[in-house]
């Protein structure tokens, strides 16, 4: 009988623990996305196996840790493309990509164009609206 009474508490504690872990994961990613981190590094940083870290992260956000890191990097890269005169190579490395080839491939996958094309399109749009 005591086991049954403890089961719901265990379920709640697990949910609370998962919430805490997800917060730790997102904080770690936000503080380190510009480094060459991988999902394994994130799991290690919060004391979890990477598969479990990915599982609870996907349950919470509907995306994998790797995709979340890529989205965050691309968002920051777009900001830098539009607000600085940095080279694409410098932006790639500053946003955590280990090569311009990887940056271009990831950018293309997410935005269906290269970083250079993206900047050119937005520059044209801004000139037209002036």
Task: Label the model's feature ranges.
Residues 1-13, 17, 52:
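An amphipathic alpha-helical interaction segment
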């Amino acid at each position: 009988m005591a086991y049954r009474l403890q089961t719901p508490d265990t379920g709640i504690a697990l949910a609370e623990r998962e919430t805490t872990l997800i917060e730790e994961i997102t904080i770690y990613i936000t503080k380190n996305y510009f480094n060459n981190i991988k999902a394994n590094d994130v799991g290690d940083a919060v004391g979890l196996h990477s598969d479990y870290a990915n599982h609870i992260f996907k349950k919470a956000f509907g995306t994998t840790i790797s995709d979340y890191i890529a989205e965050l990097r691309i968002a920051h890269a777009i900001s830098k493309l539009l607000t600085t005169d940095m080279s694409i190579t410098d932006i790639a490395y500053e946003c955590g990509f280990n090569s311009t080839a990887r940056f271009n491939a990831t950018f293309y996958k997410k935005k269906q164009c290269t970083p250079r094309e993206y900047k050119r399109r937005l520059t044209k749009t801004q000139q037209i609206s002036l």
